[in-house]
Each structure stands twice: as structure tokens, then as C-alpha cells.
Regions:
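A short alpha/beta connector and helix-capping loop motif
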Residues: 172-204
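Glycine-rich, proline-tolerant flexible connector loops at the mouths of alpha/beta enzymes
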Residues: 1-20
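Active-site acidic/histidine proton-transfer and metal-coordination neighborhood
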Residues: 14-158, 162
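Short, glycine/acidic-enriched loop or turn micro-motifs at the edges of active sites
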Residues: 169
Length: 208
């Protein structure tokens, strides 16, 4: 459930409001479902190609405002549906080639997430989480939101966010059977991405 909607009007991502997702709420209520919500930090002209880690302050501010808007929408979804809304923060920020500076982008990324989570929300209803990734197309050499970054951010910001384990975003020798109990030694709750594959592969597959 990304922050993309079709309602006969254009609203840029830093201006989206709960009212734009009223149909989502109606759909979920009819089916007795809750909803999670993901900010959408990709496929937009203001990806330069970085978003929350961009050195361009105008670009970074745009995406911070998008994240804050998504926090407000997540609060709305949780209140309307009476269920916890997990708000997953993931960006594709990174570089195809080896960067000279590996710290600067992560400091900007941290600052941006700090600013997003300064938006008021009820942590009993909204559970922000930071998703990491090993690498991807276009970010083969450096991913800003690495596993170490995401887990350390969650550890240092209890009461504002929880860890998220995307069960495909690991190095080849790492396994979910070790990662989940290791996290549960320190956190009372974690979020997971899990897929049951049928006729296709996915980066979220686990063994049952």
C-alpha cells in the first residue's frame, strides 16, 4: 500500500492528505481489514536520484514533507480502522559506482528520518519502521539504508519506530531463522515482509 492514489486529481506527494485515502478506508472497513502504509520514495521527478539522503536541500525537504504527510495518513488509517498501521520507510537511495563519501548520505538520511518522526503520532497505533536492503539495480555499490543503519536507528529510537525484516534483503549467508530470534532478544515487536510464492520468485520468500 504505497502513497499513490487515483481520484481524478493531481496532488504531489508532499501535499497528500488523509482525505485522498478515504476510498482505501471504505474498502478495508467493508472487509474488516486493517491497512499498513508505505511512503513512496521513488518514481518521481524529485528523485535526483537520491531522496531522503540528497545533498540538495530542496529535494530532501520535499521528501521529508512526504514522509510527514504519510505519518498523518497512517494515523488516520489506524484511527478509522481500529487497528495498528505499520508505516514502512524504505528508499532506493544509493550509488551504482563506489562513492568517495559513505558517511555523509547516511547522516542526511538519519536527519531526514528524525524530521519525519517528529510529526506527532500515537506510537500505540502507528508503528514506523526502517527497511534496509543489501543492494539493487542502480545501487550495486552502496545502499544508504543498510542493515546496520536500519537496526541501529531502531535501537536508538525506541518509542518512535520498530525494526523491519524484509526476508530477502540479506547477504547470501544470512538466514531469517537467526535474524528474527536475535532481534526478539532486544525488541518486543518487529515487522516482517514475507511472501508465499506461487509460480514466481520474490525477495521476501521464507521456508515454512
Amino acid at each position: 500500500s504505497y502513497a499513490i492514489f487515483e481520484d481524478g486529481e493531481f496532488v504531489d506527494r508532499d501535499k497528500i492528505e488523509p482525505k485522498h485515502f478515504k476510498k482505501w478506508v471504505e474498502f478495508a472497513k467493508e472487509r474488516g481489514m486493517g491497512l499498513d502504509f508505505n511512503p513512496t520514495f521513488f518514481s518521481h521527478p524529485k528523485c535526483d536520484p537520491l531522496t531522503l539522503s540528497s545533498p540538495n536541500e530542496e529535494t530532501r525537504h520535499f521528501w521529508v514533507e512526504h514522509g510527514k504527510a504519510c505519518a498523518r495518513i497512517s494515523q488516520y488509517l489506524a484511527e478509522e480502522l481500529g487497528q495498528i498501521c505499520t508505516m514502512n520507510i524504505w528508499t532506493g537511495d544509493g550509488f551504482k559506482d563506489i562513492p568517495a563519501d559513505r558517511l555523509g548520505p547516511r547522516l542526511r538520511y538519519k536527519q531526514s528520518i528524525d524530521e519525519i518522526l517528529s510529526e506527532p503520532f500515537d506510537f500505540n497505533k502507528v508503528k514506523p519502521c526502517i527497511e534496509s536492503k543489501v543492494f539493487g539495480i542502480g545501487v550495486e555499490s552502496y545502499t544508504v539504508g543498510s542493515a546496520e543503519f536500519a537496526l541501529n536507528y531502531a535501537a536508538m529510537n525506541r518509542g518512535k519506530c520498530i525494526p523491519l525484516m524484509d526476508n530477502g534483503h540479506y547477504h547470501p549467508t544470512e538466514v531469517v531463522s537467526d535474524k528474527i530470534p536475535a532481534l526478539l532478544s532486544f525488541f518486543s515487536e518487529i515487522a516482517l515482509h514475507i511472501t508465499r510464492p506461487v509460480r514466481w520468485d520474490s525477495d521476501h520468500v521464507v521456508l515454512f
